[in-house]
Amino acid sequence: MFQIYYTGQFKKDLKLIKKRSAENFDSLRGVVDILESGGHFSLNVGYKKHKLSGSYSNHWECHVLPDLLLIWLQSELEKRIILVRAGSHADLF
């Protein structure tokens, strides 16, 4: 089981997602629950998880929905996940 932490920017992203679509918010919550239970290892291939590079070096990303992304940092040793950003491709990149 991983501890989940949130950045201030993630909290802002979450408010925007909830305002745009309750269904997207629920889908994101489901992925966060999966991550909490087993980290990135517990996500199946349908989420297209992968490591990022550049300014998000060492971060993970997955596709909650085709245009809803989640970016996080994960520490295996500390069993900690920091949720960094969430949103559409246009919002994040």
Question: Which functions belong to the PLM regions below?
Answer:
Residues 1-66, 75-80, 90-93:
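Basic, Lys/Arg-enriched alpha-helical interface segments
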Residues 72:
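Acidic, metal-associated active-site segment
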Residues 87:
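Residues forming the ATP-binding cleft of Hanks-type serine/threonine protein kinase domains
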